[in-house]
């Protein structure tokens, strides 16, 4: 991810004290920088996407706005039940960010292909689905999404 993307994440944390960043394993490559600056608002869940999504829903019920970063294939498939029951149905204000969508991580094998994440999330009518084509578009969407109390999924191939 680019410097511009990291700056975008830092701005989200700086501008809104109710935002948190939850990340699974290596979804955010500069995770340690964010965690050093915001140790109580940036949490690494390791390879535990399902627990991370349920935790995010709990935070949302307390008025927080969690941004949940995960490798798209694992975030959408391993945690789909939690996304459905904990985020979509109660309309929890959770922002799901599927990183490295499509075949971006093809070097790691077909388990890392996220070619059906849109189809899965698209079955959940309560979740707004975005596929930004640029960091500028992502910035606009994140800024607007902070004012909307509903779940979202961002499919990123940036």
PLM region descriptions:
Residues 1-157:
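Thiamine diphosphate
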């Amino acid at each position: 991810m680019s410097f511009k993307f990291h700056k975008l994440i830092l701005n989200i944390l700086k501008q809104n004290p109710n935002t948190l960043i939850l990340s699974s394993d290596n979804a955010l490559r500069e995770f340690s920088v964010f965690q050093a600056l915001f140790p109580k608002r940036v949490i690494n869940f390791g390879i535990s996407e399902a627990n991370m999504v349920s935790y995010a829903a709990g935070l949302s019920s307390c008025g927080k706005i969690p941004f949940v970063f995960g490798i798209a294939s694992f975030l959408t498939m391993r945690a789909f039940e939690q996304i459905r029951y904990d985020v979509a149905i109660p309309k929890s204000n959770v922002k799901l960010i599927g990183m490295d969508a499509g075949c971006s991580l093809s070097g790691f094998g077909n388990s890392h292909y996220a070619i059906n994440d849109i189809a899965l999330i698209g079955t959940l009518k309560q979740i707004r689905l975005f596929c930004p084509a640029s960091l500028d578009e992502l910035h606009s969407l994140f800024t607007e999404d902070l004012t909307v109390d509903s779940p979202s999924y961002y499919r990123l191939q940036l």
